[in-house]
Every structure is written in C-alpha cells, then in structure tokens.
C-alpha cells in the first residue's frame, strides 16, 4: 500500500501525523511589529520528530542544527513540496527534495 497518493494526502487508514514524522520540512516565518511593520523573514529546515496535541517538533539542520523548533500543530499548513533544490534566502543554504513546506506570520505584541 502506498503511504501517500500524488496529491500528498495520506493513504486510507494512515494518519497524517504519523506520515509526517521523519519528513524534511522547510519553514518560512515572517515577523511583524504589533503595528504590522515588517521586521524580518527567516527560513529554517529540518526533520519532523514528533507531532504533539498543540505543536509539531522539528529537529533543525544546517546552520541551526541540533535545535528543536516548534510550530503550531496545523497539518493543513504543511504543503507537499515539489522535488528540487530550494535555496533559503535568509541563509543561502540549499535544501534538496524537501517533503513539505510551511509558512507562518508572527506578529509581536506591543511594548509594555
């Protein structure tokens, strides 16, 4: 039985949270000030190590190797990546054939 069909969806009876463990993920994060002003854009990559009730744990590779990074548990935000070499604009690193990509916007709270 195939684990994934061509659309990237899990095969019948296989939960997506199980399928993504061990998969290579590129994470894009854009940070904004509380007023919507752009701060910075970061890109990270690594392998999914666990899917928790509220988060997904990713063991980062490359310049951030060894760090565990958590993203919200929204499996719909994990998009099947097309095969190829991806260049991370923020670091210049090359990632070959990632399994998934995901993008997040983070708005910082106003200062106290």
What are these regions (language model features)?
Residues 1-112:
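Short beta-rich binding modules
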